[in-house]
UniProtKB/Swiss-Prot annotation:
GO terms for biological process: rRNA base methylation. Belongs to the methyltransferase superfamily. RsmH family. Keywords: Cytoplasm, Methyltransferase, rRNA processing, S-adenosyl-L-methionine, Transferase. It comes from Polynucleobacter necessarius subsp. necessarius (strain STIR1). This is Ribosomal RNA small subunit methyltransferase H. It catalyses: cytidine(1402) in 16S rRNA + S-adenosyl-L-methionine = N(4)-methylcytidine(1402) in 16S rRNA + S-adenosyl-L-homocysteine + H(+). Its main location: cytoplasm. It is found in: Cytoplasm. The keyword Acetylation does not apply.
Length: 316
């Protein structure tokens, strides 16, 4: 099934990176290198390629083999496709060699809409949830072996679900009866039988599915590693743009950027402001989708993009 995917904050992300001092002043003698951390269906990658000169290069990462198959159809010698997590990007580029990095942390519409991927509680399919279907346990396999405490922890921590214990207890009870959830709709029905209250506009299974997806794919661990790798790879003057879709991701991005945008000076030390060392990052902007974009693409409504620039002359 060919399901269209609309990249979120497309124009804003391109402007954020291309508007940085390095790419803005690109010429044929500059060796411009840009990284797109998640190819998805190529919207951001292809839009950025249009803004780069013929001698530029781009590396796009994705853990999803379906995304890699789409990416390999792009006939552009400037583009290198890597089947790996952006958390490993520092294995594919030299330190301080990259002019711009984009991390779009959302899952793509095909991943949600294709039932066999197991991401959607609205579509009957195997309870898989893996981005990389060649690696790791499926959500169903993990739920069959995890303890009550482990399931509770995952749903509470990554889904911020207040009924985490009750949901975990129901899963374990079904498992003990020889009926562990194997499909998306089985799990969604089980959660709905426990979570009696509904948040406005949200299915009772939303938080549980989010939690399992984040855990199975190590999304927050990858984000933390990816941010550290980005700091290592960015040239002074290069920009980092990160699009997040829920509070757990955005909190990590916000705290990371803020931590690198300040200078720790011992309290009481008599140092004039002009003599303070520079911070590693300068925070550029925080953007949300316009009302028009959300109207056209409701999945964009929770997106937040944070942009920062590595200071010239500052250490990582």
């Amino acid at each position: 099934m060919n399901i269209a995917h609309r990249p979120v904050l497309l124009a804003e992300a391109v402007t954020a990176l291309v508007g940085g001092p390095l790419i803005q002043n690109q010429n044929s003698e500059n060796h411009i290198l840009v990284i797109d951390g998640t190819f998805g269906r190529g919207g951001h990658t292809q839009a950025l390629l249009k803004e780069l000169n013929p001698s530029a290069h781009m590396i796009s990462f994705d853990k999803d083999l379906d995304a890699i198959a789409v990416a390999q159809k792009i006939n552009d010698p400037r583009l290198k496709i890597v089947h790996d997590s952006f958390a490993q990007m520092d294995q594919y580029a030299e330190a301080e060699s990259v002019d711009g990095i984009l991390l779009d942390l959302g899952i793509s519409s095909p991943q949600v809409d294709e039932a066999h991927r197991g991401f959607s509680f609205r579509r009957e399919g195997p309870l898989d949830m893996r981005m990389n279907t060649d690696h790791g346990l499926t959500a169903a396999e993990w739920l069959e072996q995890a303890s009550l405490e482990e399931i509770t922890h995952v749903i509470k921590t990554y889904g911020e679900e207040r009924f985490a214990f009750q949901i975990a207890r129901a899963i374990v009870a079904k498992r003990e009866d020889g009926l562990p959830p194997k499909t998306t709709t089985q799990l969604a029905s089980l959660v709905s039988s426990v979570v009696r209250t509904r948040e406005a506009g949200q299915d009772p299974a939303t938080r549980t599915f989010q939690a399992l997806r984040i855990f199975i794919n190590r999304e927050l661990e990858d984000l933390e590693l990816g941010l550290k790798a980005a700091m290592k790879l960015l040239k002074p003057g290069a920009r980092l743009a990160v699009i997040s879709f829920h509070s757990l991701e955005d909190r990590i991005v916000k705290q990371f950027m803020q931590a690198h945008a300040k200078v720790d000076v011992p309290r009481g030390l008599p140092v004039r402001e002009k003599d303070l060392p520079q911070s590693a990052l300068k925070i550029i902007s925080r953007l949300k989708p316009s009302d028009a974009e959300v109207s056209e693409n409701p999945r964009a409504r929770s997106a937040i993009m944070r942009v920062a620039e590595k200071r010239i002359g500052a250490a990582s």
